[in-house]
């Protein structure tokens, strides 16, 4: 399949692996790229020199294109960007911030820039900033989301109607059926997170991977909107948040409860009780942990078969 996304990134399939914190290390990114998609290293949970190590290992593991995802709220973002430049990364996805801040700088270094958005307003701002493509993420997605709570199903056609750059759909996509639906809605490609988190190549703890398999519809919820909206599993930590909400908490009280390293505790260390378990709604269709290569093949084969059936 050839389209604007495969041509932009020089990849075989218009499938991008989300750059998830504590999940998307060099092993996952290189495996996705080797299988024909675009792998992303998630820099949001890495110190600059740790990111450098992951980039160098990824280069050794694949000769295919790969990228780095950088949340712009990261406190050492200048240092991360310096590492990205020094290591010759050619694709950068940015999120959680103003795309104007880094887009021109990166593009002047001949880097392809993609920004993650959650609304038409932010999509237009990203296009104006000069990004090469946008990821439109519906609030079905695990982890941090936009406050608008727009679903992928509604967001993609609304954005596609307004912008003239490639659109990548994210949130609630985990198989060929979801990919086909997103592209019928107007997406040029898809970004997939939770499905790739449940792989042997993912950096996540085995407890977290098993939780992805156990999650059913209704087991996750978007919360902490006063801080940074996040979709997580309804575990003990989530229940503590809800109990605090009953007392009309201040932002500071919510921050105190959140504390530090909650995501690391849940995703990387496997604490299913007190950790922040960032998992998307699509987990309800993920039933086993299988290698990245098999997932890509399954998604592409199902996509092609369903497309033929759909066209009949």
Question: Which residues are covered by each model-predicted region?
Answer:
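Active-site entrance/lid segments in N-terminal catalytic domains of soluble metabolic enzymes
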Residues: 1-162, 166
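Active-site metal-binding loops of divalent metal-dependent hydrolases
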Residues: 20, 172-173
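Conserved acidic functional residues
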Residues: 116, 171-172
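Conserved active-site-proximal phosphate/metal-binding subdomains
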Residues: 146-168, 174-312
């Amino acid at each position: 399949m050839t389209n604007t996304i495969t041509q932009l990134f020089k990849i075989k399939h218009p499938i991008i692996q989300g750059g998830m914190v504590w999940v998307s290390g060099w092993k996952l990114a290189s495996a996705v790229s080797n299988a024909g998609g675009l792998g992303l290293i998630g820099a949001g949970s890495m110190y600059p020199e740790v990111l450098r190590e992951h980039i160098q290992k990824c280069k050794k593991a694949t000769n295919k294109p790969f990228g780095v995802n950088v949340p712009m709220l990261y406190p050492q973002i200048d240092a991360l960007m310096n590492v990205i430049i020094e290591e010759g990364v050619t694709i950068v996805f940015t999120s959680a911030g103003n795309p104007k801040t880094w887009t021109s700088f990166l593009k002047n270094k001949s880097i392809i820039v993609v920004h993650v958005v959650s609304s038409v307003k932010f999509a237009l701002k990203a296009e104006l900033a000069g990004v090469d493509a946008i990821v439109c993420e519906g609030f079905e997605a695990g982890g941090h989301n936009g406050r608008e709570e727009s679903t992928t199903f509604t967001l993609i056609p609304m954005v596609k109607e307004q912008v003239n750059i490639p659109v990548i759909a994210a949130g609630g996509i985990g198989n060929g059926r979801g990919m086909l639906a997103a592209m019928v809605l107007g997406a040029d490609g898809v970004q997939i997170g939770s499905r790739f988190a449940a792989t042997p190549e993912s950096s996540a703890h085995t407890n977290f991977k098993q939780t992805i398999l156990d999650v059913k519809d209704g087991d996750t919820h978007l919360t902490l909107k006063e801080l940074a909206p996040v979709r997580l599993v309804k575990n003990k930590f989530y229940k503590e948040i809800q109990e605090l909400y009953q007392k009309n908490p201040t932002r500071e009280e919510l921050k105190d409860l959140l504390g530090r390293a909650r995501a690391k505790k849940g995703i990387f260390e496997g604490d299913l009780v007190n950790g922040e378990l960032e998992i998307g709604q699509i987990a309800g269709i993920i039933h086993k942990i299988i290698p990245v290569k098999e997932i890509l093949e399954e998604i592409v084969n199902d996509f092609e078969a369903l497309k033929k059936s759909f066209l009949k």
